[in-house]
Curated annotation (Swiss-Prot):
GO MF term (any one): GTPase activity
Organism this protein belongs to: Acholeplasma laidlawii (strain PG-8A)
Protein name listed in UniProt: Elongation factor G
Annotated function: Catalyzes the GTP-dependent ribosomal translocation step during translation elongation. During this step, the ribosome changes from the pre-translocational (PRE) to the post-translocational (POST) state as the newly formed A-site-bound peptidyl-tRNA and P-site-bound deacylated tRNA move to the P and E sites, respectively. Catalyzes the coordinated movement of the two tRNA molecules, the mRNA and conformational changes in the ribosome.
InterPro entries for the chain: EF-G-like_DII, EFG_II, EFG_III, EFG_III/V, EFG_IV, EFG_V, EFG_V-like, G_TR_CS
Length: 690
């Protein structure tokens, strides 16, 4: 089947925001207006088209990234609706990796919120052009100008309105387009019924001023516009649109639009902005990959180049089995074709190719550069793997995912559950790179680890619903880490004589802190003092010892180990001896390099009425929290603080009690930090390890 939409007429976009800003409702309305669905569902009623998992419909939140495709102004728009809850940021991250542009939805009353900052950071990391949609303009307390100020203040970005709302809160009735200087008025909630009206007289001067501010903001991106404006000539609609688009594509300018998705006001204007300003696959830089020899290779959005795609999501579908979502960067591929998983060096077969609409699907014969689709039949492919033409060895940059910060033990209720649980956990871990499972060697318990309590709740619930596994779950535990804080040289010898051939391994290793860079091993052996064949054993010995910890059994992270000297024995030296010597060196570093325990620190935001600020701050301080800021949020105060995760269990109940249920809070993992000495001693004592 030939390509239906040219690359120029294709948009791959994500919709992202803080929880409850209205992402899923916005996507629903987009699908409604583009004719993809004929009846809209409401998230809070559990009827949303995009929230298709049972847990999503019950909880009224989006957990996985549902993908769908629609058409607007003869353009094909592939949309991914992403979760706003902090426990599911991995879904946002892997979606942004394969998108060309995004719509960031913010609440007109709240402005930029903590999760907005998180997803914005992720989008910036992947250099994704964005437009900003200020939603809920009909909400009590809605303030369009203040919402834009929060973009400047909290994100530090260049953002200007390209629209001006007519009215606010219950009086929100229309929009002035600052690019074309035209106005529309909305009537009725069921459909976006509009009529063109003259710009209201009381807003005319403000609209002219805001258009001039917009022109000044984007003039640097277009020389012709700059000259036209400086010479006092009228800036045409085409010229202004071109300059805005250039700024957006450079990821240096972010146009802001307004509306109320729930009331069907402004959604068509959002779609227009997507077409006018967000990139097609032709507008983004070619994707960079490397061959197995490390040679850089670029792939362009071109059907005639070799097939190259990135798998960005794996999920189990109750009807077709394992589904692998992928983005095609170059070339084309037919269903039934064989491809190479270059990441794993294995051949795979595209059994069927599906175009997804939330959890319904349409089978297609062929996909082309710029397409997002799902494949059935891939056996070994996981998130972040590259798929390419057979005999090609290009590997695209993969994705980095945060380590879990919270864990619980799960115990199957029956022998039958025991047999099924391992298989269920393996499938769930394959779908979600931030979900880890392992067996505690001391207790024999199965441990599951994730990004938060809700994350683990959902996974345990899925285990019950989808895999029919009943399990008891223990209280959540914090996932601590260990590290070294002082550089030190450590010498270790492993010598064993017991008749016949003995064991001999001798190493001298410099250990030093390596903040934020994980484990790094450097080989500086010269003159053959340790034979080359034993050096990998030293590295392996260290890596195995890191997992078991040196203080309290938690994984050791962020250290650099430089092997610089040692010796060997012609007969007794072996791989095992050097592995043991290396692990002895790491254990010895516990005291000499000042080992410490690290704990996850959460970025917490509490929004509370003024009357309870003192109670909230007192409670945060008592939890070892460090206050960062306070700022007004309508009739309330927003308090930001960094608080150890271990102190946040049960916080929701405490906050309800301290504020008579009138405050809300969100938290997300921010960084690891050293545990105070007294608490470190308690943890070590509790773990029964020295």
């Amino acid at each position: 089947m030939p390509r239906q939409y040219s690359l120029k007429m294709t948009r791959n976009i994500g919709i992202m925001a803080h929880i409850d800003a209205g992402k899923t409702t916005t996507t629903e309305r987009i699908l409604f207006h583009t004719g993809k669905i004929h009846k809209t569902g409401e998230t809070h009623d559990g009827a949303s088209q995009m929230d298709w998992m049972a847990q999503e419909q019950e909880r009224g939140i989006t957990i996985t990234s549902a993908a769908t495709t629609s058409v607007w102004r003869d353009h094909r728009v592939n949309i991914i609706d992403t979760p706003g809850h902090v426990d599911f940021t991995v879904e946002v991250s892997r979606s942004l990796r394969v998108l060309d542009g995004a719509v960031t939805v913010i609440d007109a009353q709240a402005g930029v919120e903590p999760q907005t900052e998180t997803v914005w950071r992720q989008a910036t990391e992947y250099k994704v052009p964005r437009i900003v949609y200020v939603n809920k303009m009909d909400k009590i307390g809605a303030d369009f100008n203040n919402a834009i100020k929060t973009l400047h203040r909290r994100l530090g970005v260049k953002a200007n309105a390209i629209q001006l709302p007519i009215g606010t809160e219950l009086d929100f009735s229309g929009i002035i387009d600052l690019v074309t200087m035209t106005a529309v008025e909305y009537s009725g909630d069921a459909l976006e019924t509009t009529k063109e009206i003259p710009i209201p007289a009381h807003l005319e001067e403000q609209a002219i001023d805001m258009r001039n501010e917009l022109i000044e903001a984007v003039a640097e991106f277009d020389d012709e516009l700059m000259v036209t404006y400086l010479e006092g000539e009228e800036v045409s609609v085409e010229l202004l649109k071109r300059a805005i688009r250039k700024g957006v594509l450079a990821v240096e300018f972010f146009p802001v639009v307004a509306g109320s998705s729930f009331k069907n006001k402004g959604v068509r204007k959002v779609l227009d902005a997507v077409i006018d300003y967000l990139p097609s696959p032709l507008d983004i830089p070619p994707v960079l990959g490397h061959t197995s020899e490390g040679v850089e290779v670029y792939r362009h959005a071109d059907d005639e180049e070799p097939f190259t795609a990135l798998a960005f999501k794996v999920m189990t579908d109750p009807f077709v089995g394992k589904l692998t979502f992928f983005r095609v960067y170059s070339g084309k591929i037919k269903s039934g074709s064989y491809v190479q998983n270059t990441t794993k060096g294995e051949r795979e077969r595209f059994g069927r190719i599906l175009q997804m609409h939330a959890n319904t699907r349409q089978e297609i014969d062929e996909v082309y550069a710029g397409d997002i689709a799902a494949a059935v039949g891939l056996k070994v492919t996981t998130t972040g793997n590259t798929l390419a033409t057979q005999n090609d060895d290009i590997i695209l940059e993969s994705m980095n995912f945060p380590e879990p910060v919270i864990e619980v033990a799960v115990e199957p209720k029956t022998k039958n559950d025991q047999d099924k649980m391992g298989q269920a956990l393996a499938k769930l871990a394959e779908e979600d790179p931030t979900f880890k499972t392992y067996t505690n060697t001391e207790t024999g318990q199965t441990i599951i680890a994730g990004m938060g309590e809700l994350h683990l709740d959902i996974l345990v619930d899925r285990m019950k619903r989808e895999f029919k596994v009943e399990a008891n779950v223990t209280e959540p535990q914090v996932s601590y880490r260990e590290t070294l804080t002082v550089p030190n040289e450590i010498e270790a010898k492993f010598i064993r004589q017991s008749g016949g051939r003995g064991q001999y391994g001798h190493v001298v290793i410099d250990f030093e802190p390596n903040p934020g860079k994980g484990f790094e091993f450097v080989d500086k052996i010269v003159g053959g003092v340790i034979p080359r064949e034993y050096i990998p054993s030293v590295q392996k010995g260290l890596e195995e010892a890191l997992g078991g910890g040196i203080l309290a059994g938690f994984p050791v992270v962020d250290i650099k180990a430089t092997l610089k000297f040692g010796s060997y024995h012609d007969v007794d030296s072996s791989e095992m001896a050097y592995k043991i010597a290396a692990s002895m060196a790491l254990k010895d570093a516990k005291n000499k390099a000042n080992a410490v325990i690290l704990e996850p620190i959460m970025d917490v935001e509490v929004v509370t009425p003024n009357d309870y600020v003192g109670n909230v701050i007192g409670d945060i301080t008592s939890r070892r929290g460090r206050l960062e800021s306070q700022e007004g949020r309508g009739n309330a105060i927003s308090i930001r603080a960094f608080v150890p995760l271990s102190e946040m269990f049960g916080y929701a109940t405490s906050l309800r009690s301290n504020t008579q249920g009138r405050a809300t809070f969100v938290m997300q993992f921010d960084h690891f930090d050293k545990v105070p000495k007294s608490i470190q001693e308690e943890i070590i004592k509790k773990r029964g390890s020295n």
